[in-house]
Structure formats: structure tokens, C-alpha cells
């Protein structure tokens, strides 16, 4: 898949029709009760559980012949759970997950092209470039509920305490460093250190995706248009030089997962950090007052870059289990990815941008105070080519970040080792 800049913009409302038949399917769905299995780690997360339980209740009330059976496992285990179940002949019908999960599930032979299951009118309502970001061999294999670049969240109260204007967040990495010098001198009410800037580097795939977004900030790349490793560029080197500098100055918590950064931010011990837009729900679930001190800003500009970021999305990855379950799954997906279902979700739980043209003018998005500062970044999103071993690549990026921070390794030497190891991993 070719690299693309992705422009996710708020457009005028477009009304589209709906079809109850999946594209290209002449097989007749059986009548009678149907159960579809949906793998969903969010059922185990307190901030999201009530929403998904209500989705099941409302959908089953509207579709009495269809039953939703949840398959749950923690975030880091749900994909393995799905694959292991399939190996035993028990396949789910959909996986609620992240865009980076798509290539692995396609490679495992589980994911189906979305147009094989969903109605043409429904699929055609999605922004074309968003759908292209889910493509494998020219076909989209995931359907997004909503999308977002990585955004910069910052604590307005800490900015004030440091003598900084809370309405003027940094725009460049150099500005961020000057802000960080002041913010790093603060202590919280209990005398705990305040970290100035958070960039996740822990050994989980999403941390690697976040590091890729940082490379994009600096105008660099990790993979070329053909999906080959391509890190001999200044932007890549500059990004990891920044990771190293943030560590040396003590600004960034070492080996932190996104959930660790969210916890520190919620407790007032982290002034700025990069996150997916929906990460704010994790912050708010820890500290409800976060609504009053949190603001968002565009990704920082570094080196020769323009502050581009990486597209992130929560999506459904679909599995074809025959006509009856396929037809039921079509109804379920269209029920969930609708303004009626997602309006309160995007307003109260997960600030993000709709992926459908007909949902662009939703009040819960247009007037979302948390999203306001980061909104222009939606037009500067760069797509990472899909490769089957994207998770392995992301883990190697984390290992590189840890090598130049915790390991105190020389940057150039660490990059050379990364190139050698990552090349082998992604070619397997």
C-alpha cells in the first residue's frame, strides 16, 4: 500500500441509503434466531463497560432474533484469545480493536474484506482515504468506529503554576523543551515529581505506533511505500535523539505504557503527553476533575517535518461465518457505527473524529472542548503501510527507545542494531 497523507476533515452531512444485503453475496441468509460472537476487551475496562452493555441491550431489543455473545480478555490478550479459539474451530464474528491489529488477523486468515459483509451504501459513507488506510492488497479489512491522530494533552493548571500561558501550548519540539524546563521544577501537592513530557516507550505494540507518530512529526519514515524498512533518514534519527534527550533531562517517565502516562496525568504528575484522543477516557476514569484542567494541542513540529502524525482508529475486524451470521453482523455493525449510538460515546467517553461523512456534523464532535485544540491535526495524518509483522516492528521500535534511554546506548549504534534486528523480524 502506498504511503498517503490522510485528510480527515469535518464535512457537511450526507444522507445515504442503506441496503440489507452484503456486497456480492447471493447466498441466502437462514431465518430464525442467530447468535454472533463479538470479541471485545473493553468489557473489562470500567470506563467502557456500561456503554457496551447498553449496546447489547438496545441492539437485541431492536433485533429480537439476534443475540450478541461477548468474548472477553484483557487488551493485551484478546487477539491471542481470538486466534486460539479459531484454531479450535470456534471463530468469533467480529473483533473490536485497533487498526494495527488488522494485518496480523488478515495474515492469520481470519479477517474478511468488509465489502463481503457490509452493505455498499454503508461502506461508501466512510471517507475514502480512511478506508484506504485499512487496505490489504487493495481491499479494506477493517471498518472504523472513529479515528484520530496522536494528540498532545496538557494540564492547564500546571502550565499556570509554571508561569506559562495555558492557552498557548507549544507548537514545536524546541518550544516544548523550553516549556519542559519550567514544568519539570514543579511538585504536586504531595511533593511528588512532576514529569514535563510523556512519550510511551514500554514494550507493547501501541508504544511502537506512538513512536512512529513521533518519527512522522520530524518528517521521517519507518517503512517505505512498499512496506520495506526505511530508517536511513534524518527524521527517524531526530525523533529518537529527542527520546534520548527527554530521558537525559528527566522529563519523560522511563518505560511507561500509555496507561501509566494517563495515570500520572490524571494525578497531576505529568504536564504534557502524547496519546490517542480516546485515551482521555482513561484519564477521566481516574480523576473526574480532569475535564477541567485538560486541553489538547496539535502534534509538535520537529526538524524538517510539519507535525504529521499517525492515523489511529478503533475498528471492527470482521469474520465471515456464513450467510446467517454475516447478515446479523451487518446489522450489528451498522447499529453501532451510527450517530444515535456513538453521539454520547464520543461526547462523554471517547473524544475522537467520526469516520463517516454523514456523522461529520455531530454536535458531540463539533463542540467537543477536549478535541478543539487538536482538531487541525486531523488533516495532517500520514498512513503507515500495512505489513503482516507490524506488531513485531513496533516492539523493535520500543526496544530502540529503551536502548537509548534505560540502556544509555549511543544513538547511531542503537539504530544500526535496530536495523539489523527489525529487518529480520519483519521478513519472517
Where are the regions that the model predicts?
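Hinge/lid segment of periplasmic solute-binding proteins
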Residues: 24, 74, 97-151, 177, ...
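Conserved N-terminal structural module of periplasmic/extracytoplasmic solute-binding proteins
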Residues: 4, 8-11, 19-104, 122, ...
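Short helix-initiation/N-cap motifs at beta->coil->alpha
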Residues: 72-81, 100, 171-177, 253-267
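Alpha-to-beta junction loops
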Residues: 86-97, 110-111, 267-275
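Extracytoplasmic/periplasmic substrate-recognition and gating elements
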Residues: 57, 61-62, 162, 237, ...
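Long, aromatic- and glycine/proline-rich binding clefts that accommodate carbohydrate-like moieties
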Residues: 297-298, 346-403
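Extracytoplasmic/periplasmic solute-binding protein
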Residues: 141-145, 150, 160, 175-228, ...
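Glycine-centered hinge/linker elements that transmit conformational signals in sensory
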Residues: 179-182, 225-255
Amino acid at each position: 500500500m502506498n504511503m498517503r497523507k490522510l485528510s480527515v476533515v469535518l464535512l457537511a452531512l450526507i444522507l445515504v441509503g442503506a441496503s440489507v444485503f452484503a456486497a456480492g453475496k447471493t447466498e441466502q441468509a437462514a431465518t430464525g434466531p442467530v447468535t454472533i460472537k463479538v470479541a471485545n476487551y473493553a468489557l473489562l475496562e470500567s470506563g467502557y463497560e456500561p456503554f457496551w452493555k447498553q449496546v447489547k441491550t438496545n441492539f437485541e431489543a431492536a433485533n429480537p432474533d439476534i443475540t450478541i455473545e461477548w468474548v472477553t480478555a484483557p487488551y493485551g490478550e484478546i487477539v491471542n484469545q481470538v486466534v486460539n479459539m479459531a484454531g479450535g474451530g470456534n471463530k468469533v464474528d467480529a473483533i473490536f480493536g485497533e487498526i494495527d491489529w488488522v494485518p496480523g488477523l488478515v495474515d492469520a486468515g481470519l479477517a474478511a474484506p468488509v465489502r463481503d459483509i457490509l452493505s455498499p451504501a454503508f461502506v461508501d459513507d466512510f471517507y475514502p482515504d480512511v478506508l484506504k488506510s485499512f487496505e490489504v492488497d487493495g481491499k479494506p479489512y477493517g471498518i472504523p468506529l472513529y479515528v484520530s491522530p496522536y494528540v498532545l494533552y496538557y494540564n492547564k493548571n500546571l502550565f499556570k503554576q509554571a508561569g506559562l500561558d495555558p492557552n498557548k501550548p507549544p507548537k514545536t519540539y524546541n518550544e516544548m523543551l523550553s516549556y519542559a524546563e519550567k514544568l519539570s521544577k514543579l511538585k504536586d501537592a504531595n511533593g511528588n515529581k512532576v514529569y514535563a513530557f510523556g512519550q510511551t516507550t514500554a514494550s507493547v505494540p501501541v508504544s511502537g505506533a506512538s513512536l512512529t507518530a513521533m518519527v512522522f512529526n520530524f518528517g521521517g519514515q519507518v517503512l517505505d511505500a512498499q512496506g520495506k524498512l526505511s530508517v536511513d533518514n534524518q527524521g527517524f534519527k531526530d525523533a529518537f535523539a529527542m527520546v534520548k534527550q527527554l530521558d537525559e533531562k528527566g522529563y519523560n517517565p522511563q518505560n511507561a505504557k500509555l496507561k501509566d502516562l494517563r495515570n500520572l496525568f490524571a494525578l497531576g504528575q505529568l504536564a504534557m503527553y502524547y496519546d490517542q484522543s480516546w485515551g482521555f477516557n482513561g484519564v477521566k476514569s481516574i480523576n473526574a476533575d480532569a475535564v477541567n484542567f485538560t486541553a489538547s494541542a496539535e502534534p509538535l513540529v520537529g526538524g524538517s517535518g510539519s507535525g504529521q502524525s499517525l492515523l489511529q482508529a478503533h475498528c471492527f475486524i470482521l469474520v465471515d461465518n456464513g450467510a446467517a451470521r454475516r447478515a446479523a453482523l451487518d446489522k450489528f455493525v451498522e447499529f453501532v457505527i451510527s450517530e444515535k449510538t456513538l453521539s454520547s460515546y464520543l461526547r462523554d467517553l471517547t473524544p475522537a473524529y467520526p469516520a463517516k461523512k454523514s456523522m461529520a456534523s455531530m454536535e458531540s464532535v463539533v463542540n467537543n472542548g477536549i478535541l478543539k485544540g487538536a482538531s487541525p491535526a486531523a488533516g495532517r495524518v500520514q498512513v503507515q503501510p500495512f505489513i503482516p509483522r507490524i506488531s513485531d516492528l513496533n516492539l523493535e521500535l520500543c526496544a530502540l527507545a529503551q536502548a537509548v534511554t534505560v540502556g544509555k546506548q549511543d544513538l547511531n549504534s542503537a539504530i544500526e542494531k535496530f536495523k539489523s534486528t527489525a529487518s529480520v523480524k519483519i521478513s519472517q
